[in-house]
Protein backbone atom coordinates (compact mmCIF):
# COMPACT_ATOMS: atom_id res chain seq x y z
CA UNK A 1 0.00 0.00 0.00
CA UNK A 2 1.39 3.41 -0.98
CA UNK A 3 1.16 6.20 1.58
CA UNK A 4 0.59 9.76 0.43
CA UNK A 5 3.14 12.35 1.48
CA UNK A 6 2.11 14.56 4.36
CA UNK A 7 1.23 17.99 3.02
CA UNK A 8 2.92 21.01 4.62
CA UNK A 9 1.07 24.31 4.83
CA UNK A 10 3.52 27.12 4.11
CA UNK A 11 3.47 30.86 4.77
CA UNK A 12 5.71 33.00 2.53
CA UNK A 13 6.60 36.45 3.88
CA UNK A 14 7.63 39.00 1.27
CA UNK A 15 5.83 37.21 -1.55
CA UNK A 16 5.94 40.30 -3.77
CA UNK A 17 9.74 40.67 -3.64
CA UNK A 18 12.31 39.24 -6.04
CA UNK A 19 12.88 36.03 -4.08
CA UNK A 20 9.49 35.80 -2.39
CA UNK A 21 7.63 36.07 -5.70
CA UNK A 22 9.49 33.09 -7.15
CA UNK A 23 9.26 31.10 -3.91
CA UNK A 24 5.51 31.70 -3.63
CA UNK A 25 4.74 30.82 -7.25
CA UNK A 26 6.96 27.73 -7.22
CA UNK A 27 5.23 26.46 -4.08
CA UNK A 28 1.80 27.16 -5.60
CA UNK A 29 2.71 24.99 -8.59
CA UNK A 30 3.97 22.22 -6.31
CA UNK A 31 0.83 22.34 -4.18
CA UNK A 32 -1.22 21.34 -7.23
CA UNK A 33 0.82 18.17 -7.74
CA UNK A 34 -0.66 15.05 -6.17
CA UNK A 35 2.70 13.58 -5.16
CA UNK A 36 4.01 16.84 -3.65
CA UNK A 37 4.47 17.46 0.07
CA UNK A 38 3.36 21.09 -0.33
CA UNK A 39 -0.15 21.84 0.89
CA UNK A 40 -1.81 25.23 1.24
CA UNK A 41 0.45 28.17 0.39
CA UNK A 42 -0.30 31.71 1.55
CA UNK A 43 1.82 34.71 0.60
CA UNK A 44 2.04 38.04 2.39
CA UNK A 45 3.39 41.07 0.55
CA UNK A 46 3.54 44.79 1.23
CA UNK A 47 -0.10 45.27 0.29
CA UNK A 48 -1.14 43.28 3.37
CA UNK A 49 0.16 46.12 5.55
CA UNK A 50 1.54 43.70 8.14
CA UNK A 51 4.15 45.48 10.26
CA UNK A 52 6.54 42.60 10.86
CA UNK A 53 8.86 44.76 12.97
CA UNK A 54 6.13 44.97 15.60
CA UNK A 55 6.25 42.14 18.12
CA UNK A 56 2.73 40.67 17.82
CA UNK A 57 1.79 41.57 14.24
CA UNK A 58 2.54 38.18 12.69
CA UNK A 59 1.24 36.27 15.71
CA UNK A 60 -2.17 37.95 15.38
CA UNK A 61 -2.29 37.01 11.69
CA UNK A 62 -1.33 33.39 12.38
CA UNK A 63 -3.87 33.08 15.19
CA UNK A 64 -6.64 33.92 12.71
CA UNK A 65 -5.36 31.74 9.87
CA UNK A 66 -4.71 28.05 9.26
CA UNK A 67 -1.85 26.30 11.02
CA UNK A 68 1.40 26.66 9.07
CA UNK A 69 4.05 23.95 9.21
CA UNK A 70 6.65 26.30 7.72
CA UNK A 71 7.15 30.03 7.44
CA UNK A 72 9.67 31.25 4.85
CA UNK A 73 10.95 34.75 5.59
CA UNK A 74 12.00 36.46 2.36
CA UNK A 75 11.52 39.97 3.78
CA UNK A 76 14.59 42.21 3.82
CA UNK A 77 15.65 45.79 3.25
CA UNK A 78 18.45 45.32 0.72
CA UNK A 79 19.31 48.88 -0.33
CA UNK A 80 22.77 48.91 1.24
CA UNK A 81 23.51 52.52 0.26
CA UNK A 82 20.35 53.83 1.92
CA UNK A 83 20.96 51.63 4.97
CA UNK A 84 24.37 53.25 5.31
CA UNK A 85 23.71 56.86 4.39
CA UNK A 86 20.06 57.80 4.95
CA UNK A 87 18.32 58.17 8.29
CA UNK A 88 15.13 56.54 7.00
CA UNK A 89 17.21 53.83 5.31
CA UNK A 90 18.98 53.06 8.58
CA UNK A 91 15.62 52.79 10.36
CA UNK A 92 14.11 50.52 7.69
CA UNK A 93 17.17 48.29 7.64
CA UNK A 94 17.09 47.85 11.41
CA UNK A 95 13.34 47.25 11.46
CA UNK A 96 13.21 44.69 8.64
CA UNK A 97 16.64 43.05 8.90
CA UNK A 98 17.22 42.99 12.68
CA UNK A 99 13.91 43.36 14.55
CA UNK A 100 11.48 41.61 12.19
CA UNK A 101 13.31 38.22 12.10
CA UNK A 102 13.33 38.07 15.92
CA UNK A 103 9.60 38.82 16.16
CA UNK A 104 8.79 36.49 13.26
CA UNK A 105 10.66 33.71 15.07
CA UNK A 106 8.82 34.38 18.33
CA UNK A 107 5.47 34.24 16.52
CA UNK A 108 6.39 31.02 14.72
CA UNK A 109 7.40 29.34 17.98
CA UNK A 110 4.13 30.39 19.61
CA UNK A 111 2.24 28.67 16.78
CA UNK A 112 4.65 25.71 16.54
CA UNK A 113 5.77 26.64 13.04
CA UNK A 114 9.23 25.96 11.63
CA UNK A 115 11.04 28.97 10.21
CA UNK A 116 13.28 29.23 7.16
CA UNK A 117 15.05 32.59 7.34
CA UNK A 118 17.05 34.02 4.42
CA UNK A 119 20.26 35.85 5.30
CA UNK A 120 23.33 37.15 3.50
CA UNK A 121 27.05 36.83 2.84
CA UNK A 122 27.39 40.41 4.12
CA UNK A 123 27.67 39.04 7.66
CA UNK A 124 31.24 38.27 6.52
CA UNK A 125 34.04 40.44 5.18
CA UNK A 126 37.77 40.34 4.48
CA UNK A 127 38.15 41.05 8.22
CA UNK A 128 36.31 37.86 9.20
CA UNK A 129 38.29 34.87 10.36
CA UNK A 130 41.55 36.48 9.25
CA UNK A 131 43.74 33.36 9.27
CA UNK A 132 41.16 31.35 7.34
CA UNK A 133 40.81 34.12 4.76
CA UNK A 134 44.57 34.60 4.32
CA UNK A 135 44.84 30.93 3.47
CA UNK A 136 42.46 31.56 0.58
CA UNK A 137 39.46 29.76 2.03
CA UNK A 138 35.79 30.54 1.51
CA UNK A 139 33.57 31.08 4.51
CA UNK A 140 31.78 28.18 6.20
CA UNK A 141 28.69 28.47 8.45
CA UNK A 142 30.94 28.24 11.51
CA UNK A 143 33.38 30.94 10.29
CA UNK A 144 33.75 34.11 12.32
CA UNK A 145 31.37 36.87 11.23
CA UNK A 146 32.56 40.45 10.82
CA UNK A 147 30.12 42.70 8.91
CA UNK A 148 31.50 46.03 7.72
CA UNK A 149 28.29 47.87 6.84
CA UNK A 150 24.91 48.61 8.42
CA UNK A 151 23.07 46.10 6.24
CA UNK A 152 25.40 43.25 7.23
CA UNK A 153 25.28 44.21 10.91
CA UNK A 154 21.48 44.31 10.91
CA UNK A 155 21.22 40.97 9.08
CA UNK A 156 23.56 39.41 11.64
CA UNK A 157 21.36 40.75 14.46
CA UNK A 158 18.41 39.14 12.67
CA UNK A 159 20.20 35.78 12.59
CA UNK A 160 21.01 36.06 16.30
CA UNK A 161 17.39 36.94 17.06
CA UNK A 162 16.14 33.84 15.24
CA UNK A 163 18.66 31.51 16.89
CA UNK A 164 17.98 32.91 20.36
CA UNK A 165 14.21 32.63 19.93
CA UNK A 166 14.55 28.96 18.92
CA UNK A 167 17.04 28.01 21.66
CA UNK A 168 14.56 25.50 23.14
CA UNK A 169 13.63 24.14 19.70
CA UNK A 170 16.90 24.12 17.75
CA UNK A 171 15.49 21.79 15.10
CA UNK A 172 12.73 24.28 14.38
CA UNK A 173 14.65 26.75 12.22
CA UNK A 174 17.05 26.99 9.31
CA UNK A 175 19.05 30.05 8.29
CA UNK A 176 20.06 30.10 4.63
CA UNK A 177 22.79 32.60 3.83
CA UNK A 178 22.98 33.45 0.18
CA UNK A 179 24.88 36.01 -1.91
CA UNK A 180 24.56 38.32 -4.91
CA UNK A 181 21.02 37.11 -5.50
CA UNK A 182 19.51 37.67 -8.93
CA UNK A 183 16.08 36.99 -10.39
CA UNK A 184 13.56 38.30 -12.90
CA UNK A 185 11.16 39.96 -10.48
CA UNK A 186 13.39 42.93 -9.67
CA UNK A 187 14.68 45.51 -12.15
CA UNK A 188 17.30 46.51 -9.56
CA UNK A 189 19.09 43.16 -9.53
CA UNK A 190 22.71 43.18 -10.71
CA UNK A 191 21.84 41.65 -14.08
CA UNK A 192 19.16 44.26 -14.81
CA UNK A 193 21.36 47.15 -13.63
CA UNK A 194 24.28 45.85 -15.68
CA UNK A 195 22.12 45.56 -18.81
CA UNK A 196 20.82 49.11 -18.23
CA UNK A 197 24.44 50.23 -18.08
CA UNK A 198 25.17 48.35 -21.30
CA UNK A 199 22.28 50.03 -23.12
CA UNK A 200 23.35 53.46 -21.87
CA UNK A 201 26.95 52.80 -22.94
CA UNK A 202 25.93 51.67 -26.43
CA UNK A 203 23.91 54.87 -26.86
CA UNK A 204 26.18 57.50 -25.33
CA UNK A 205 29.72 56.18 -24.91
CA UNK A 206 31.93 56.05 -28.01
CA UNK A 207 34.40 53.67 -26.37
CA UNK A 208 31.60 51.25 -25.44
CA UNK A 209 33.36 50.63 -22.13
CA UNK A 210 31.48 49.52 -19.01
CA UNK A 211 33.38 49.85 -15.72
CA UNK A 212 33.19 46.88 -13.34
CA UNK A 213 34.83 46.41 -9.95
CA UNK A 214 37.47 43.76 -9.50
CA UNK A 215 37.93 44.19 -5.74
CA UNK A 216 34.65 42.58 -4.61
CA UNK A 217 34.39 38.82 -4.38
CA UNK A 218 31.39 36.65 -3.63
CA UNK A 219 29.19 34.06 -5.39
CA UNK A 220 26.27 34.98 -7.73
CA UNK A 221 23.14 32.98 -6.88
CA UNK A 222 19.82 32.77 -8.74
CA UNK A 223 16.43 32.72 -7.05
CA UNK A 224 15.86 29.38 -8.80
CA UNK A 225 18.90 27.87 -7.09
CA UNK A 226 17.94 29.26 -3.69
CA UNK A 227 14.45 27.79 -4.03
CA UNK A 228 16.00 24.34 -4.50
CA UNK A 229 17.86 24.89 -1.22
CA UNK A 230 14.65 25.93 0.54
CA UNK A 231 12.86 22.82 -0.72
CA UNK A 232 15.79 20.71 0.48
CA UNK A 233 15.24 22.03 4.02
CA UNK A 234 11.56 21.06 3.87
CA UNK A 235 12.03 17.69 2.16
CA UNK A 236 14.90 16.53 4.37
CA UNK A 237 13.84 18.29 7.61
CA UNK A 238 17.17 20.13 7.81
CA UNK A 239 17.95 22.64 10.51
CA UNK A 240 20.76 25.01 11.46
CA UNK A 241 22.74 27.47 9.34
CA UNK A 242 23.61 26.76 5.70
CA UNK A 243 25.34 28.54 2.83
CA UNK A 244 22.93 28.41 -0.11
CA UNK A 245 25.22 29.30 -3.01
CA UNK A 246 26.44 27.42 -6.11
CA UNK A 247 29.95 26.04 -6.44
CA UNK A 248 32.92 28.02 -7.77
CA UNK A 249 36.19 26.85 -9.30
CA UNK A 250 38.05 29.66 -7.55
CA UNK A 251 37.75 31.45 -4.24
CA UNK A 252 34.85 33.66 -5.19
CA UNK A 253 33.85 35.70 -8.23
CA UNK A 254 34.51 39.39 -8.89
CA UNK A 255 31.86 41.74 -10.31
CA UNK A 256 34.07 41.96 -13.40
CA UNK A 257 34.03 38.17 -13.86
CA UNK A 258 30.29 38.12 -13.21
CA UNK A 259 29.61 40.77 -15.86
CA UNK A 260 31.85 38.99 -18.39
CA UNK A 261 29.97 35.73 -17.78
CA UNK A 262 26.65 37.52 -18.39
CA UNK A 263 27.91 38.95 -21.68
CA UNK A 264 29.40 35.64 -22.85
CA UNK A 265 26.24 33.74 -21.98
CA UNK A 266 23.90 36.22 -23.69
CA UNK A 267 26.10 36.32 -26.81
CA UNK A 268 25.71 32.55 -27.14
CA UNK A 269 21.90 32.74 -27.01
CA UNK A 270 19.77 32.61 -30.14
CA UNK A 271 19.02 36.04 -31.61
CA UNK A 272 21.80 37.57 -29.48
CA UNK A 273 22.69 39.97 -32.30
CA UNK A 274 19.35 41.68 -31.78
CA UNK A 275 20.54 43.24 -28.53
CA UNK A 276 23.95 44.34 -29.83
CA UNK A 277 26.37 43.13 -27.17
CA UNK A 278 29.38 42.38 -29.36
CA UNK A 279 30.87 45.89 -29.06
CA UNK A 280 30.81 46.10 -25.27
CA UNK A 281 34.17 46.17 -23.48
CA UNK A 282 34.58 45.71 -19.73
CA UNK A 283 36.94 48.03 -17.91
CA UNK A 284 38.30 46.80 -14.55
CA UNK A 285 38.20 49.35 -11.72
CA UNK A 286 38.80 49.31 -7.98
CA UNK A 287 36.31 51.18 -5.84
CA UNK A 288 36.05 51.65 -2.11
CA UNK A 289 32.59 51.61 -0.61
CA UNK A 290 30.44 50.35 2.23
CA UNK A 291 30.63 46.71 1.23
CA UNK A 292 32.86 43.73 1.99
CA UNK A 293 35.66 43.16 -0.50
CA UNK A 294 35.57 39.43 0.21
CA UNK A 295 32.45 37.58 1.38
CA UNK A 296 32.54 34.39 -0.72
CA UNK A 297 30.89 31.43 1.00
CA UNK A 298 31.37 27.71 0.41
CA UNK A 299 28.32 25.70 -0.67
CA UNK A 300 26.80 23.58 2.13
CA UNK A 301 23.29 22.92 0.77
CA UNK A 302 21.60 22.56 -2.60
CA UNK A 303 22.65 21.05 -5.95
CA UNK A 304 26.38 20.65 -6.58
CA UNK A 305 26.32 22.88 -9.64
CA UNK A 306 28.67 25.68 -10.61
CA UNK A 307 27.59 29.30 -10.68
CA UNK A 308 28.34 29.64 -14.42
CA UNK A 309 25.93 26.81 -15.25
CA UNK A 310 23.23 28.33 -13.04
CA UNK A 311 23.73 31.70 -14.72
CA UNK A 312 23.56 30.16 -18.22
CA UNK A 313 20.34 28.31 -17.36
CA UNK A 314 18.80 31.51 -15.99
CA UNK A 315 19.80 33.70 -18.95
CA UNK A 316 18.71 31.15 -21.55
CA UNK A 317 15.34 30.72 -19.85
CA UNK A 318 14.76 34.47 -19.62
CA UNK A 319 16.54 35.69 -22.77
CA UNK A 320 13.39 36.98 -24.51
CA UNK A 321 12.27 38.90 -21.41
CA UNK A 322 15.73 40.41 -20.92
CA UNK A 323 15.98 41.38 -24.60
CA UNK A 324 12.58 43.07 -24.31
CA UNK A 325 13.77 44.84 -21.16
CA UNK A 326 16.81 46.21 -23.00
CA UNK A 327 14.70 47.30 -25.97
CA UNK A 328 12.26 49.09 -23.67
CA UNK A 329 14.92 51.09 -21.80
CA UNK A 330 16.74 51.93 -25.05
CA UNK A 331 13.74 53.94 -26.29
Language model features: what each stretch is:
Residues 13, 44, 71-75, 115-121, ...:
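SDR active-site strand-loop-helix element
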Residues 53-98, 109:
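NAD(P)H-binding glycine-rich loop region in Rossmannoid oxidoreductase-like domains
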Residues 252-260, 281-320, 324-330:
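Conserved C-terminal active-site "lid" loop/helix of NAD(P)H-dependent oxidoreductases
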Residues 88-95, 99-100, 123-176, 180-182:
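Catalytic helix-loop patch of NAD(P)-dependent Rossmann-fold dehydrogenases
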Residues 229-230, 235-290:
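Mid/C-terminal beta-alpha module of Rossmann-like enzyme folds, strongest
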Residues 2-30:
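N-terminal Rossmann NAD(P)H-binding glycine-rich loop of SDR-like oxidoreductase domains
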Residues 39-61:
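Adenosine-cofactor binding site in Rossmann-like domains, unifying the SAM/SAH pocket
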Residues 130, 161-218, 224-225:
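NAD(P)-dependent short-chain dehydrogenase/reductase
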Amino acid sequence: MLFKKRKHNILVLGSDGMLGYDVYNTLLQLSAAEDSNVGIVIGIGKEAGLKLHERNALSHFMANSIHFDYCINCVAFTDTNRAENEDIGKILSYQLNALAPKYIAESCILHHTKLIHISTDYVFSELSDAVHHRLGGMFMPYSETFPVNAYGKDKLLGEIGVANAYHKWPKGYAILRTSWLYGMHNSKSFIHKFLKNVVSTLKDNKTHEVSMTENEKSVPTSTYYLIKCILSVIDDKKYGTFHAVPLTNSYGVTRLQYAKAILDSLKSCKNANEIGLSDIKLKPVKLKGHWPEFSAMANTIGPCRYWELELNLFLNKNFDALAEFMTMIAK
